[in-house]
Design a protein with these regions (language model features):
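Hydrophobic alpha-helical segments at protein termini of multi-pass membrane proteins
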Residues: 1-110
Length: 110
């Protein structure tokens, strides 16, 4: 069973959501931190930035959010395997909304 929306498979849309969310949040945070009035309030992100691990963590998160569901989708063939795509979709949406918030802060800082 191939699930699709407007000709795009749900699987590819899930991976694109994760990619757009993680990359968008990372870039908007980097840009936002260039402004003196904007500070990072997430203590985990502050810890990662102070130790030079922030980019590595986001790259690993992107790899896991795409790699693990892709592996599971190909390893098992039962119909419920589509549920694993909730992980990259939800992660991508959460990071996408963080990106929107960051852009909002950047615009307000002008």
């Amino acid at each position: 069973m191939d699930l699709s929306i407007y000709g795009y498979s749900i699987e590819s849309l899930a991976y694109l959501t994760a990619l757009a969310g993680i990359v968008g949040d990372h870039l908007s945070t980097r840009i936002g931190l260039l402004y003196p009035m904007i500070r990072e309030m997430n203590p985990f992100t502050v810890f990662l930035r102070q130790n030079g691990l922030w980019l590595l963590f986001d790259v690993l998160m992107l790899g896991v959010s795409i790699g693990v569901p892709a592996l599971l989708m190909r390893k098992w063939s039962f119909n419920g395997r589509w549920a694993v795509l909730a992980f990259p979709i939800l992660l991508g949406l959460a990071r996408f909304f963080a990106m929107v918030y960051n852009v909002f802060l950047i615009v307000l800082s002008f």
